[in-house]
Regions:
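Short amphipathic alpha-helix used as the core "switch/output" element in two-component signaling
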Residues: 41, 63-75
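Two-component/phosphorelay signaling modules centered on CheY-like receiver
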Residues: 12-31
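Active-site residues of response regulator receiver
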Residues: 54, 82
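Basic, Lys/Arg-enriched C-terminal extension of HTH/homeodomain DNA-binding domains
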Residues: 187-210
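Active-site beta3 strand of CheY-like receiver
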Residues: 46-52
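Short, flexible helix-to-coil linker/hinge segments that flank and couple to helix-turn-helix
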Residues: 88-95, 99-154, 196, 207-209
C-alpha cells in the first residue's frame, strides 16, 4: 500500500514539484496546504502516514505546526523542509518533534529516503546537517534554548508578519486581552522594546523570511 503524504509549503510551485516527485516514486499525496493552520486541519481530516512541512510558512510556521502534530496525530511523523543548515534550526526542529530534517537543496535526492525512514519509525537528517547536529551535542550547554513557548512563538510570528493584537487574537482563537498578555511576556523574555526587535528575532529563529 502506498505511503500517504500531506504536503505543506506556502509556495505552490514548490508543492507541485514535490508532489510530482513523490507521485513518480509511487507515493500518494492526500493533501496540500499553504500554511501550518491549513496543514493541521487537513491532517485531522486525511490522517496521513507522513507529513512534510516547510519550516517557514505564514500564520503558523512549520516548527510549531510540527509540535501541534505531535499532539494531534502522534503516530504521524513529520519531515521538515528548510534551507537552514545552522544547528539552532536543527535542534529546534528536533525538540519540536520532527522525525526528519531535509534541506530544500537536497530534496530531490533525500526527501524520498527521509519519508521511507520516518515511515518505518526511524529518523532522518540530510547528510549536510548531520555534522552540525553532532557538533551541537558535543557543545551541549553552550547555546540557550528558545525561551519562548510554542504559543508565544505563534504570537511572535504573527506580530512579525504585521498583524495587530486584535488580528493575532482572531487567528489564534484567543481573546484580545490574552494576545496582549502574550505580547508583553514575549517582550519581557526577549528584553525587547519594540516591534522591530521582535521582527529581527523572528527572522533569526527562522519564523519568517527576511
Amino acid at each position: 500500500m502506498a505511503i500517504r503524504i500531506l504536503l505543506a509549503d506556502d509556495h505552490e510551485i514548490v508543492r507541485q514539484g514535490l508532489k510530482a516527485l513523490l507521485e513518480q516514486k509511487g507515493y500518494q499525496v492526500v493533501g496540500e496546504a499553504a500554511n501550518g493552520h491549513e496543514a493541521l486541519k487537513l491532517a485531522a481530516k486525511t490522517k496521513p502516514d507522513v507529513a512534510v512541512f516547510d519550516l517557514t510558512m505564514p500564520l503558523l510556521n512549520g516548527l510549531d505546526a510540527t509540535q501541534e502534530m505531535t499532539h494531534l496525530l502522534p503516530k504521524t511523523p513529520v519531515v521538515l523542509l528548510t534551507m537552514h543548515t545552522e544547528e539552532q534550526y536543527i535542534l529546534d526542529a528536533l525538540r519540536a518533534g520532527a522525525r526528519g530534517y531535509v534541506l530544500k537543496s537536497e530534496a530531490a535526492t533525500n526527501l524520498v529516503a527521509a519519508i521511507e525512514e520516518v515511515a518505518k519509525g526511524s529518523s532522518y537528517l540530510s547528510p549536510r546537517v548531520s555534522r552540525a547536529v553532532m557538533q551541537a551535542y558535543l557543545d551541549k550547554g553552550k547555546r540557550a534554548e528558545d525561551p519562548l513557548s510554542s504559543r508565544e512563538r505563534q504570537v511572535l510570528q504573527l506580530i512579525a508578519e504585521g498583524k495587530s493584537t486584535k488580528e493575532v487574537a482572531v487567528v489564534l482563537g484567543i481573546s484580545t486581552k490574552t494576545a496582549e498578555s502574550h505580547r508583553s511576556r514575549i517582550m519581557e523574555k526577549l528584553n525587547s522594546h519594540g516591534t522591530a526587535a521582535l521582527v529581527r528575532y523572528a527572522i533569526r529563529r527562522g519564523l519568517i523570511e527576511p
